[in-house]
Amino acid sequence: MIGITCYGAYVPRLRLSRAAAAQANAWANPGLLAQARGERSMANWDEDSLTMAVEAARDALAGRNTDGIGALYFGSTTHPFADRQNAGLVAAALDLPESISSSDLGGAQKAGTSALNAALDRAAAGRPGEALVVAAEHRRARPGSAQELQYGDAAAAFTVGSSAVIAEFLGSHSVSVDFVDHYRATGQEFDYIWEERWLRDEAFQKWVPAAVKAALEKMEIDPEAIHHFVLAEPVAKLSALVAKRCGITETAIADSLLGVV
């Protein structure tokens, strides 16, 4: 059996009220008022994705012996260093053994799940020791944009191994498509955003349900047997839309924390 053996998280204390931001910029972008609910987390001036990753990892590893960690994977699209291994800095801050293998993963917002997949593949291959997975984001957005209300700052961490498993890994399915709902070119500070309906209609009504259905079929799991369905939704109500298309009951939909992170 392989899977997650412990977990941790870090969410900055500071908050940006979506209502306050929307009201301040509604004169230029009235559409912001539709997203003026809840708040998002906001990193302080001395925080970035690396410092948040360290805090999440410390939360996950609290009270544990770290000598058995054999690898560290750090997923983010906002690594502070372009040519200096960020994962190595996380390992140093955690005082992990110098003999561990460390890797940065980026290039897309699925960097965190890519890091988790790499750790699970490592465990499935029977490699010795646990793998530490950290994911963190500190994304910048244009002032007055919808993304300013959506891009919360936070980090999560997991250890993956084959003993003392608290969440068994049953399987996965991946779909690799060059879907351009947004992008950020090298050297650019902000994302270039395309029509948001394109994201909803093409990605969340087509590609995401296809991946979920394929994963369930591969593992021979009835969609109605799912008790917890968690989707990283950029805007509200997408979880219900995807769950319905996948045959997952509405009662299984978990809070995406969109309203507080």
Spell out what each predicted region is:
Residues 1, 75-81, 107-112, 135-140, ...:
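Acidic, glycine-rich active-site loops and adjacent beta-strand->loop/helix elements
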Residues 1-47, 145-202, 206, 210-213:
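Condensing-enzyme catalytic core mediating Claisen C-C bond formation in acyl metabolism
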Residues 4-6, 60, 72, 90, ...:
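Buried hydrophobic positions in well-ordered alpha/beta secondary-structure cores of metabolic enzymes
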Residues 30-34, 39-50, 78-130, 241-261:
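Conserved catalytic cysteine-centered active-site region
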Residues 56-70, 210-225, 246-249:
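Phosphate/pyrophosphate-binding loops at sites that engage ATP/ADP/AMP, CoA/4′-phosphopantetheine
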Residues 70-78, 104, 229-230:
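Short glycine-rich or small-residue beta-strand-to-loop segments that form or flank ligand, phosphate
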Residues 75, 131-137, 159-160, 170, ...:
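Short beta-strand segments
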Residues 124-157:
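Flexible, glycine-rich active-site loops centered on histidine and acidic residues
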